[in-house]
């Protein structure tokens, strides 16, 4: 997964490529994103847990990335994302609870720049979303998220068997 994030960040075009890591593991995800970014690329980390962000700050500092290349937003993703610039981000990695996936996708998609990619790890629940007998809230939310992404007319969607199922949605 990490090298995939590096590749997606490296493939982004522009002078100041911006990425977002929405995950408790922003230190690890951020390092992979930084590896693919140019020297002017920026990683925005969104996580309500201050402890996770403190760990990421020290990890990035120890790896030699200056504070000017990282932005930390200690908030719930759905509370802060609506205030971010539209069509400004080239990679958004969103590791969120499955129940939040549908709302997160609807909030994140306008932020993706043309050619940018929304990365949704573990979103396919090991293919249980294809089982119509599964009607629990988590499976229904994952199914709704998958159907919504596939309905986006301005998206190329790929599903990969990484983790419990990865969705990549790239904006046309």
Predicted regions and their residues:
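S-adenosylmethionine/decaboxylated-SAM
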Residues: 2-172
């Amino acid at each position: 997964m990490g090298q995939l994030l590096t590749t997606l960040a490296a493939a982004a075009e522009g002078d100041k490529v911006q990425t977002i890591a929405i995950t408790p593991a922003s230190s690890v995800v951020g390092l992979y994103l930084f590896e693919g970014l140019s020297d002017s690329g920026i990683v925005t980390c969104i996580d309500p847990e201050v402890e996770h962000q403190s760990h990421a700050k020290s990890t990035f500092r120890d790896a030699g990335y200056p504070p000017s290349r990282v932005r930390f937003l200690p908030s719930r993703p759905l509370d802060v994302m609506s205030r971010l610039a539209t069509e400004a981000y080239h990679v958004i990695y969103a590791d969120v609870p499955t129940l939040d996936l549908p709302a997160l996708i609807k909030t994140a998609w306008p932020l993706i720049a043309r050619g940018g990619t929304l990365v949704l790890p573990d979103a396919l629940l090991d293919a249980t979303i294809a089982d119509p007998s599964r009607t629990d809230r988590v499976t229904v939310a994952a199914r709704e998220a998958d159907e919504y992404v596939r309905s986006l007319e301005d998206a190329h969607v790929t599903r990969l068997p990484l983790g419990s199922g990865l969705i990549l949605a790239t904006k046309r």
